[in-house]
């Protein structure tokens, strides 16, 4: 049974009626929780200013010859370099110089001045650290002293999470095809709550990382399966808008991270509160039906018919008999077309030199989109000003970006919108690098422009990739692009960590990649107004048609766009934030 025949059901019961809208917003609400967990480490993994803890009780503190400080307050005064230190006198008369990762004991106990040229002996920070608590009372870093020689453990918090995202998207996508969408939705959402709470109550670093890893797997699994679930209930006339705007709910999660981080400054309480966002979905997800698409593929025709009847009743429409509409063979499960069951490996994406260039360009765009998306978000704490407001604003601009994509891609074309979005992102990165840090407001505004542009590109690449390849490898093309995207999301935190070497390294990486991707995008064929390719010959013809640039205006743009969305079956689609 082809997707075109299945669309006949929606012609009877409605493409996006009341039934589909209720399901859509229930499932989209859980995307908010996924967005929360993807970016929770922006604040949970913050490394506050700190100094080594002295080996005894302090009687006096000196910093740059000013002595009216408490030791807890001086941490915020240290520069990012290692040369600054705090001089303290202990109650036993010893004088120590405390820096970020070491401490020195002065041999001459009569000199408490900041400048000291006498002999001193260096000791490691075996007594722990004193952290600045003006911004955060505690973070995962302060909980387990992930600084200095243990700093690399803190750097793994977000990359390991993204590695879990990579595995989860593959694992749960497989399970949903075997066990059904409904079961996996319930299992992943329940597990998100359990692993989220487990991370908050972790007794050590390794338990915390394990809980976060499994949290990432189930969150990613939900995003993939939830996307397929809602797309299998929505008809072709609404599928493009509905699929793109699922990203908007993910962006709302970013807003909640910023708001919760501002209100709650203790990491485990922050994590617990964020984890409760998934509770409303857990309470109602058990009433969600299985999709008729999956039921039919399993030969469960009576159950599929019941769901279609319920859809028609909710939508106040007339139902239809699946056996007549789809000409079902009631003796066995619905079979796919030969091209759908035919297996293809990655080498098919390098069918010839033309397709090879197309594949490498598409992969680069996926990589750039993900790298830019997470670099802008994770780097919000380095923009200056209020870091919570920065992240909030960077999340807000995503929502109009997806609306812009939905409108612009059918007006001026996929390739044009994608290329100029990448160029705009590259330009924003370049402008941020030349803005003096004292003008941080201008820097934040420019970063918002960059996030808007990269969000638009990121939202468009899913559909554009599917339109560039023939049916026999379409799912493989989107899936491989999604995998490249997730590899970039693993590397993005390391790029942000390099800002300690030079604060603009993330912008340099993203800007360079976006500029290169934009140039190469202009070499791709335009797919607006063209039917989806079903063979390699038709896919290659896209390129020749692009070069010829026929002057004939395509009057059926909107209809053909709908046909493309129809032909991209939910099984071909994937969601990889």
Curated annotation (Swiss-Prot):
Q: Which reaction does it catalyse?
A: (R)-carnitine(in) = (R)-carnitine(out); spermidine(in) = spermidine(out)
Principal localization?
membrane
Q: Which UniProt keywords apply?
A: Cell membrane, Developmental protein, Differentiation, Glycoprotein, Ion transport, Membrane, Spermatogenesis, Transmembrane, Transmembrane helix, Transport
Region annotation Disordered: residue ranges?
A: 543-577
Q: How does activity depend on pH?
A: Optimum pH is 8.5 for carnitine uptake and transport efficiency decreased at more acidic pHs.
Q: Which residues are glycosylated?
A: 57, 65, 68, 108, 345, 352, 546, 558
Pfam families the UniProt entry points to: Sugar_tr (PF00083)
Q: InterPro entries recorded for this chain?
A: MFS_dom, MFS_sugar_transport-like, MFS_trans_sf
Record-annotated membrane-spanning stretches: 23-43, 152-172, 183-203, 214-234, 244-264, 268-288, 359-379, 389-409, 416-436, 441-461, 476-496, 501-521
One Gene Ontology term of the biological-process aspect is: acid secretion
**Compartment(s) where it occurs, according to its Swiss-Prot or TrEMBL record:** Cell membrane
Give tissue specificity per the record.
Expressed in testis and epididymis (at protein level). Expressed in endometrium (at protein level); highly expressed during the normal secretory phase, but expression is significantly reduced in the proliferative phase. Expressed at lower levels in adult tissues including bone marrow (at protein level). Expressed in hematopoietic cells, including CD34(+) leukocytes. Expressed in fetal liver (at protein level), brain, lung, kidney, heart, skeletal muscle, spleen and thymus. Expressed in leukemia cells. Abundantly expressed in ovarian cancer clear-cell adenocarcinoma.
Coiled-coil ranges per the record? none
Q: How does it sit in the membrane?
A: Multi-pass membrane protein
This entry carries the following GO cellular component terms, namely: cytosol; membrane; plasma membrane
Record field: compositional bias (Low complexity): 551-560
Please give the family membership noted in the entry: Belongs to the major facilitator (TC 2.A.1) superfamily. Organic cation transporter (TC 2.A.1.19) family.
Extra information: Involved in the uptake of clinically used drugs such as anticancer agents doxorubicin and bleomycin.
Record's function text: Facilitative organic cation transporter that mediates the transport of carnitine as well as the polyamine spermidine. Mediates the partially Na(+)-dependent bidirectional transport of carnitine. May mediate L-carnitine secretion from testis epididymal epithelium into the lumen which is involved in the maturation of spermatozoa.
Please identify the protein, giving its name as recorded: Solute carrier family 22 member 16
Per the UniProt record, the source organism is: Homo sapiens
> In the UniProt record, what gene is named as encoding this protein?
SLC22A16
